[in-house]
């Protein structure tokens, strides 16, 4: 009886959440899609709105630039997150538990605040920029433009790759690695032939989430882009 009550309670909560999701997320998206392909005067199917959108170079170039930044940021985030997860899982490093916590916490900061923090560090008048200028006499342009956007996005997003890959490595059977080592495979060969194929689904899942987060972020390019 108690089990049935708990089941009904959680089922009711799930249905309530589903209703809110349909009303406030699914329905507005369907309505926008409907209005984008229906002519309000003739009520006929039309693609004029999409034609006008892609005919303007400004919108088209913005979409291409966003895609370019997103792909580069996702690749760099994967290059950082994958080896870091493997090293922290495979090598006993003092304080690795605290480092793992810091990596996860760094992902929790909002992108807008993270971008502003990087400007305070590496902007034209940033803390690190002023130190380099005062010691070496080198005046840096700061962390602006395409390279700055990609760098900030990658450093903001790599913890997601790290968490996914780290979870996959935690569930791997160590006997596979030991068997490969007994067969004479080098560390690089073990990573390339055994570890990487097994964690690839988690890596792709994390990369997809990074791609969506970066592509939908407006605050970071607005602060760092400077017209890119």
Model-derived features with residue positions:
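A short amphipathic helical element positioned immediately N-terminal to and/or at the very start
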Residues: 1-2, 45-54
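Membrane-water interface segments at the C-terminal ends of transmembrane alpha-helices
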Residues: 7-40, 55-170, 196-218
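Extracytoplasmic catalytic/substrate-binding loops of multi-pass membrane glycan-assembly enzymes
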Residues: 42-47, 227-228
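Short coil/turn motifs that cap or connect alpha-helices
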Residues: 94, 185-186
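Helix-turn-helix DNA-binding elements, focusing on the entry/boundary residues of the two helices
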Residues: 176
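Hydrophobic positions on the alpha-helical face of helix-turn-helix-like DNA-binding modules
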Residues: 179-180, 190, 194
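Glycine/proline-centered hinge or cleavage motifs at structural transition points of membrane proteins
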Residues: 183-185, 197
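Contiguous mid-protein beta-loop-alpha structural module that forms a pocket-lining wall or clamp
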Residues: 212, 221-227
């Amino acid at each position: 009886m108690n089990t049935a009550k708990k089941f009904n309670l959680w089922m009711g909560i799930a249905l309530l959440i589903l209703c809110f999701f349909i009303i406030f997320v699914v329905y507005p998206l369907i309505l926008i899609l409907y209005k984008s392909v229906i002519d309000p005067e003739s009520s006929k199917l039309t693609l004029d709105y999409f034609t006008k959108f892609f005919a303007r170079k400004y919108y088209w170039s913005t979409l291409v630039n966003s895609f370019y930044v997103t792909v580069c940021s996702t690749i760099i985030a994967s290059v950082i997150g994958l080896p870091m997860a493997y090293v922290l899982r495979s090598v006993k490093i003092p304080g690795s538990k605290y480092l793992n916590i810091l990596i996860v916490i760094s992902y929790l900061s909002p992108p807008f605040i993270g971008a502003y923090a990087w400007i305070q560090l590496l902007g034209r008048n940033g803390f690190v920029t002023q130190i380099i200028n005062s010691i070496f006499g080198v005046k840096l342009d700061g962390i602006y433009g395409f390279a700055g956007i990609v760098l900030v996005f990658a450093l903001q997003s790599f913890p997601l790759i790290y968490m996914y890959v780290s979870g996959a490595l935690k569930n791997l059977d160590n006997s596979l690695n030991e068997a490969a080592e007994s067969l004479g495979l080098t560390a690089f060969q073990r990573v390339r032939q055994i570890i990487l194929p097994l964690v690839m689904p988690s890596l792709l899942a994390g990369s997809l989430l990074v791609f969506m987060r970066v592509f939908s972020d407006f605050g970071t390019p607005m602060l760092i882009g400077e017209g890119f």
